[in-house]
A protein has these predicted regions:
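Iron-sulfur-associated redox domains of electron-transfer enzymes in respiratory
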Residues: 1-191
Length: 191
């Protein structure tokens, strides 16, 4: 609920998030009339809607174009490996850093020892390599029913890496693309 915490939502996160009690918390807020914006993978949005069992006018849902959901255990093991290799604690992760520019996915790790620099693409970084080759997603992700034009949410966001083909002004830069799916979202965007 704090404006300063908005930055925590930014950036790609190539690992399954922990839903925990968020569906219950969202329902409580919705029942009190609070405006709730719930974001997640399409299957998480579908899970929320299934849990709620009814539509709420004060609920805005945002999903993302998902290419799979790697295991948190695999990610923890990856971090442990990096900490052993560099003999230092990882303090931050950027899954799709723009360190080498907009057209190159880079894994950036921050360490307690700030002299350690880790900026590697999918050719060298194991987590990115496994992710982009589809080797670390759950089996259900490979037959996902939500990979379609029809979306379960009010908004869908994704990284539009081929924007240069659509807009000469963007040149070789990336921009997030937002697609709206209903009249409510149109009103929210333009009001």
């Amino acid at each position: 609920n704090k404006k300063e915490e908005i930055q925590l939502f930014r950036g790609s996160k190539y690992v399954q998030s922990k839903i925990g009690h968020t569906y219950q918390e969202a329902k409580k807020l919705l029942q009190t009339g609070c405006l709730v914006c719930f974001s997640g993978t399409p299957c998480q949005i579908a899970g929320l809607k299934n849990y709620l069992k009814k539509d709420y006018a004060n609920l805005i849902t945002v999903d993302l174009v998902c290419r799979g959901n790697p295991s948190p255990l695999l990610f923890r093991k990856y971090l442990e490996y990096q900490q052993i290799k560099y003999k230092n604690k990882v303090t931050g992760v950027k899954f799709r850093d723009k360190y080498y520019g907009y057209n190159y996915s880079t894994m950036t790790l921050d360490f307690e020892d700030e002299r350690i620099q880790y900026h590697y693409g999918m050719e060298a970084d194991l987590m990115l390599k496994f992710f982009f080759k589809g080797l670390c997603s759950k089996p259900a992700c490979h037959q996902c029913v939500f990979k379609s034009i029809e979306r379960v949410s009010d908004f869908t966001i994704f990284d539009c890496w081929n924007a240069k083909f659509y807009n000469k002004i963007m040149d070789k830069k990336f921009f997030p693309l937002l697609i709206q799916f209903c009249r409510l979202t149109s009103q929210l965007l333009y009001s």
